[in-house]
Structure formats: C-alpha cells, structure tokens
Amino acid sequence: MAILGLGTDIVEIDRIEAVISRSGDRLAKRVLSANEWAQYQAHQQPVRFLAKRFAVKEAAAKAFGTGIRNGLAFNQFEVFNDELGKPKLRLWDEAERLAARMGVTSVHVTLADERHYACATVIIES
C-alpha cells in the first residue's frame, strides 16, 4: 500500500452560517448527496453538519489532487458513519471513476469540530 494523496481542510462554522442566512439551503443542496441532504434536514445542528461535510469534501478534493472541477462535484463525495461511528467516504460518479483510474483501494477520513471550526483530513491509498 502507498499513500496517493493527503488533503486537509478547516472551515469556519460562522461563515457557513452566514451563507445559509444569506442564501438559504443553496449551498447545502450543492454540496450534499441525497442521503446527506436528508440527514441535514433532520439534524439538530444543521450548520455544524454542513460545515463538517464541507470540510471533508474539500479535503478529499485536495487528496485526489483535482479540486472541484472537470466533472467532479462536492455531492459525489458522501460522508457516512460505520457501525462504530467512524466517518467514511463513499464515492459516486466521476469521483468513483477517478479513484479507479488512480488505483485507490482505501480512503481514510478523520473529522473534528470545536466551537468555531470544523476540520477534516482525508488520506487515499493504493
């Protein structure tokens, strides 16, 4: 196994809250997968939920070395939790095809949030 990429991102939660205040759910609809959207709508702290997902997806785009462009979209990275609560990343569409082309066999995610910030790190391996 070899590390193919590493990405880290930090999000100021107040900035996400300001965007939601200005433009409603537009950002959430652009960033979240269908499964994440359902969780967001039911979540007790939707701003924190969105900030954490945004951080993971930015970190993933950095780990893949592509950013969000050329057919790659935020909603193609889906954050979910395993049975123990560990965050995982599911890839869809172009993100899944890119991972296959790169020979990705494992994606590791770590996620943390505090009062003002959400941060995430994503490591991809072959």
Curated annotation (Swiss-Prot):
One of its GO terms (biological process) is fatty acid biosynthetic process. Pfam families: ACPS. Its EC number is 2.7.8.7. Mg(2+) binds at D9, E58. The keyword NADP does not apply. It is found in: Cytoplasm. Keywords: Cytoplasm, Fatty acid biosynthesis, Fatty acid metabolism, Lipid biosynthesis, Lipid metabolism, Magnesium, Metal-binding, Transferase. Transmembrane segments: none annotated. Its cofactor is Mg(2+). The keyword Cell membrane does not apply. It catalyses: apo-[ACP] + CoA = holo-[ACP] + adenosine 3',5'-bisphosphate + H(+). GO terms for molecular function: holo-[acyl-carrier-protein] synthase activity; magnesium ion binding. One of its GO terms (cellular component) is cytoplasm. Its main location: cytoplasm. Belongs to the P-Pant transferase superfamily. AcpS family. Transfers the 4'-phosphopantetheine moiety from coenzyme A to a Ser of acyl-carrier-protein. This is Holo-[acyl-carrier-protein] synthase. The lineage of its organism: Bacteria, Pseudomonadati, Pseudomonadota, Gammaproteobacteria, Enterobacterales.
